């Protein structure tokens, strides 16, 4: 990306990076906050800030190797300047960049990345080893390379209010061009990155932003109008809203989560979408699950996971993840499967899904569960790898309960 030589933009970038790297802020949230801090920035300014923050977060380890030191709060300007030197850009003649030596940076980059895949592709050693152990080095290396690509913005047409062709036309009238995707009936891809949340089409509830891979999960559950469906880890409701559309607003969806604030957000989104068959339930005790035992035609368990399938979209997670967290999340996944599967009625079904691509979070968890619960049978499963699909990575398994 070409440099925009305005100091206030670089102040915004370095402030955002400090909060992401040293104050545990999520990159997407911090970028949004930074962009809101100066209403005078135009679209090019905002794009420059967002892209630079995402790029430098994504390539953190490689940039550090080229700097010859780890990034710290007091060398963030040097860190950002190093990135632009590696991109072949000429830095502004500012005091903050005076220490940077282009020749040394390029030499260190060559030395440190030539024979070290983890440095070159900017991934922690432990995470590279984990993925290589589970998927095999060749497969994992392709996935790591794909993680470093920029993610497309994909939206899902809200069938309750419009169809894909009409939505394309409405967005085009607002200056936004989109393309369709084969095998994804409701998906549109934006040709250029833009803030679609400001469009009238979004305010009218005609679409939601949702990755193409994620859009397959609600379909995988095979819901029908009139069913009783539980989305047990609903969060802010991306898949809940899709289920409502697939059910044509008929039947009952219980959207559940342990975080009440997420359900509050879901209610707002449901109102905008015209989704009227959703009832939220805050999981604040085991009684909430017990009341629904053996009652649901379908249960969706989109469980918490490592998120290794969505690093392209959330590059800061590479630096926030720990082996301890992944081990704990696997225990949580099994616990959710054990407890929440009780809501499936005889003859009903559940879908277990994650945005991870690790077998230890996916196929292995399903296998363990079925061995302990022979009343459930694996009917179908799907693994989406970002390197093959071009979109986020997901796993989904459809389990049927005996009548």
Region locations from a protein language model:
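S-adenosylmethionine
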Residues: 1-403
